């Protein structure tokens, strides 16, 4: 589907809306799955207020649901300089792509038993950091600044001793979004992961939040109703949450993210399309994988690599027929993606109604089904 885009659709200001602070969910629901669902018919504009637990009632027969199976890494490290000053580092490179360097000048001085890799991350410190500065995060993790980029993004040498995932699990914090105004806690270790998350897909720096609403029992219900499942991988990184700063959104450059689509998933989608069954993307990350690969390759095919696709009104969707998603931040690339799918004015009108009806917004908030 392609919406006829207008000049207003390309203005960043066209994606602004007022959101009362108390509509931003600070905690997950008491139980997983106790979320609301706002169903939007993107052709007629009809809106239905429902429960997410009743999702099966609102899906077309035989739908293929495609979910992101990446798992959130406790990627936020709190440490200090040699002088004692506090620093913070958020690893952006997907964990499976952190490859130890061979011994040589690029790897610096590596002590026996230690590994080193060049990675990308976000750095914050009370005083400016410079190339060559060394930062410590416990006894077995440290970072040396290589190059500082814009908005805190930096290339660094990451030094570690032991198993890297274990070290992050021990020393790291879940990188909750800044609009959640509290420290991460024990509940987030479970509730900020989806039921689709796989240990061998550990490395996202934010949850694919549409998946947070699903429970094992809901998956069983959907399967019993004749719906099918497929998975893709997108390691959620800077591209998903970096702000759009251009007055004309067409000038925005997305930061790339690493994705994987298996032959099994491609075949499941081909069968669904051949049978006339809809493909339902569980979240904008799943949507970005499918559309990113199909756009880059001309068709959907098995793929492991990067995507920097940016969808906004005027984009023609090639794979995704329906979309399950949360409510997104004003002026964000994700709101633009949803607007590309259902029309900017229709989406913003739906958001206004959701605010009036008391829906919870953003990562731990309620969901929409756009069909």
Swiss-Prot record:
EC number: 2.4.99.17
InterPro entries: QueA, QueA_dom1, QueA_dom2, QueA_sf
Gene3D superfamilies: QueA-like (3.40.1780.10)
Localization terms from the record: Cytoplasm
GO biological process: one example: tRNA wobble guanine modification
Species per Swiss-Prot/TrEMBL record: Nitratidesulfovibrio vulgaris (strain DP4) (Desulfovibrio vulgaris)
UniProt catalytic activity: 7-aminomethyl-7-carbaguanosine(34) in tRNA + S-adenosyl-L-methionine = epoxyqueuosine(34) in tRNA + adenine + L-methionine + 2 H(+)
Class in the EC hierarchy, top level: transferase
Name this protein carries in UniProt: S-adenosylmethionine:tRNA ribosyltransferase-isomerase
Family to which the UniProt record says this protein belongs: Belongs to the QueA family.
Domain of life: Bacteria
Quaternary state and interactors: Monomer.
Keyword hit for S-adenosyl-L-methionine: yes
Pfam families referenced in this protein's UniProt entry, alphabetically: Queuosine_synth
Keywords noted in UniProt: Cytoplasm, Queuosine biosynthesis, S-adenosyl-L-methionine, Transferase
Biological role stated in the UniProt entry: Transfers and isomerizes the ribose moiety from AdoMet to the 7-aminomethyl group of 7-deazaguanine (preQ1-tRNA) to give epoxyqueuosine (oQ-tRNA).
Disulfide bonds: none
Pathway listed: tRNA modification; tRNA-queuosine biosynthesis
GO MF annotations in UniProt: S-adenosylmethionine:tRNA ribosyltransferase-isomerase activity
GO terms under cellular component: cytoplasm
């Amino acid at each position: 589907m392609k919406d006829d885009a207008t000049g207003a659709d390309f203005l960043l200001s066209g994606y602004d809306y007022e959101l009362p602070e108390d509509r931003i969910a600070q905690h997950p629901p008491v139980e997983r799955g106790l979320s609301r669902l706002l169903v939007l018919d993107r052709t007629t504009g009809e809106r239905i207020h429902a429960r997410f637990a009743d999702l099966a009632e609102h899906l077309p027969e035989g739908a293929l649901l495609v979910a992101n199976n990446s798992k959130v890494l406790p990627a936020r490290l709190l440490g200090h300089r040699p002088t004692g000053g506090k620093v913070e580092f958020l690893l952006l490179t997907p964990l499976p792509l952190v490859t130890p360097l061979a011994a040589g000048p690029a790897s610096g001085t590596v002590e026996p038993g230690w590994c080193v890799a060049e990675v990308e991350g976000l750095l914050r410190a009370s005083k400016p950091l410079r190339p060559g500065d060394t930062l410590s995060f416990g006894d077995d993790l440290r970072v040396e600044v290589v190059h500082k980029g814009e908005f805190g993004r930096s290339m660094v040498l990451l030094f570690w001793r032991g198993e890297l995932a274990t070290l992050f699990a021990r020393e790291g914090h879940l990188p909750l979004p800044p609009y959640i105004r509290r420290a991460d806690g024990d509940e987030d270790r479970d509730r900020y992961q989806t039921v689709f998350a796989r240990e061998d897909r550990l490395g996202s720096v934010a949850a694919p939040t549409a998946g947070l609403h699903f429970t094992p029992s809901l998956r069983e219900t959907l399967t019993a109703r004749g719906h099918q499942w497929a998975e893709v991988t997108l390691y959620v990184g800077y591209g998903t949450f970096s702000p759009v700063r251009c007055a004309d959104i067409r000038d925005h450059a997305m930061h790339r993210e690493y994705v994987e689509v298996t032959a099994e998933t491609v075949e499941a989608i081909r069968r669904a399309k051949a049978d006339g069954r809809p493909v339902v993307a569980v979240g904008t990350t799943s949507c970005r994988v499918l559309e990113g690969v199909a756009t880059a390759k001309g068709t959907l095919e098995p793929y492991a690599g990067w995507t920097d696709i940016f969808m906004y009104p005027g984009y023609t969707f090639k794979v995704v027929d329906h979309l399950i998603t949360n409510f997104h931040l004003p002026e964000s690339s994700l709101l633009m993606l949803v607007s590309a799918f259902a029309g900017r004015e229709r989406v913003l009108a739906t958001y206004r109604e959701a605010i009036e009806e008391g829906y919870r917004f953003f990562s731990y908030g309620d969901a929409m089904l756009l069909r």
